[in-house]
Amino acid sequence: MAAPPCPPRRPISAPCFLLCFLLGFVAGLFPFAHRHLHLDLHLPLPPPATAILVREDPPSVVVDVDTPLPAAAEERKLLLVVTPTRARPLQAYYLRRLAHTLRLAPSPLLWLVVESGAATRDTAALLRGCGVMYRHLSSPVPDAPQDRPRRRGRRQDRPAVDSRARQRNTALDHIEHHRLHGIVYFADEDNVYSLDLFYHLRDIRSFGTWPVATLAPGKSKTILQGPVCEGSRVVGWHTTDRSKNQRRFHVDMSGFAFNSSKLWDAKNRGHQAWNYIRQLDTAKEGFQETAFIEQLVEDETHMEGVPPGCSKIMNFHLHLEDKNAIYLNGWQTTQNLDVIIPLKKEARPLL
């Protein structure tokens, strides 16, 4: 039996559609949530990129114009430590010992190591690993007395040339040429130095000196040589060598230091009688120090006792090296390498 046909759909009229739309719109205007439920649908907006921040005024500071401002800390003076050296058995030991002391000294410090003759690779390798700012220089070797030309009718009684004086002069030439401003100090490698010495060196304004203790070989007594001070004023000298009483200043080579500007600025010297400040390589033994100091100062009034009162021994001059020791160049030898006593081969028992 066939199903009855569906009635045709009637099209929705426009007035009915508008009525449903208005009812839905009006219903959306009334809140249907619980009255105790509050929803914060208003989220805070981020501040704009061009927002202006208002800061509070800083507290007012009263400045006294009459009160002087604190002075900036004075920069440390450069220490120019000059050390002459030469190839010998204890050279590496002396240089390493001095390098350990200089490494503990406050910076800035420049170590001028001057070799007698051409600069060697062994010394250069040692200086590269010492941890101290340095400059490796070389000085020409002085001629031996038998190599000097002889003249008829004249006695050959010229004093021996001090190679260390030429080495120190090479360092002074380097300092003057490059205008290295600081305190110049001659530190021989075989001496023993206290760390306090390098702190007091920067207190020197023009020329400073202090006593040095010397331990002579084969003697149990210590010889003291240097100034006698009242405060920072030098009033006398310690000396026990009567054969050197003719010296003007009884100072050891490692017992004084001076401002490097004395080398090129005559106004900073005690007198202007010398135009070229260098050590005399032909001076007699024991008179090298006083001959050089006489070029820097005129008398004791131009000296400063370091430290005040000269009450500290800050370095020792030792004589511990054997002059007859044999030094092998590069610490290598090709002689006496044969076996003198061979080992006996003993029969080992079988296990």
Curated annotation (Swiss-Prot):
Q: Where does the record place the region Disordered?
A: 138-169
An individual GO BP term: glucuronoxylan biosynthetic process
Its membrane topology: Single-pass type II membrane protein
Q: Which residues lie on this side of the membrane: Cytoplasmic?
A: 1-11
Enzyme Commission code: 2.4.-.-
Organism, as annotated: Oryza sativa subsp. japonica (Rice)
Task: List keywords of the entry alphabetically.
Answer: Cell wall biogenesis/degradation, Glycoprotein, Glycosyltransferase, Golgi apparatus, Membrane, Signal-anchor, Transferase, Transmembrane, Transmembrane helix
**A GO CC term?**
Golgi membrane
Molecular functions (GO terms): galactosylgalactosylxylosylprotein 3-beta-glucuronosyltransferase activity; xylosyltransferase activity
Q: Does the keyword Translocase apply?
A: no
Localization in the cell: Golgi apparatus membrane
Enumerate the glycosylated residues: N259
Q: What class of enzyme is it?
A: transferase
Q: What is this protein called?
A: Probable glucuronosyltransferase Os10g0205300
What is the protein's known function? Involved in the synthesis of glucuronoxylan hemicellulose in secondary cell walls.
**Matches recorded under InterPro entries:** Glyco_trans_43, Nucleotide-diphossugar_trans
Q: Which residues cross the membrane?
A: 12-32
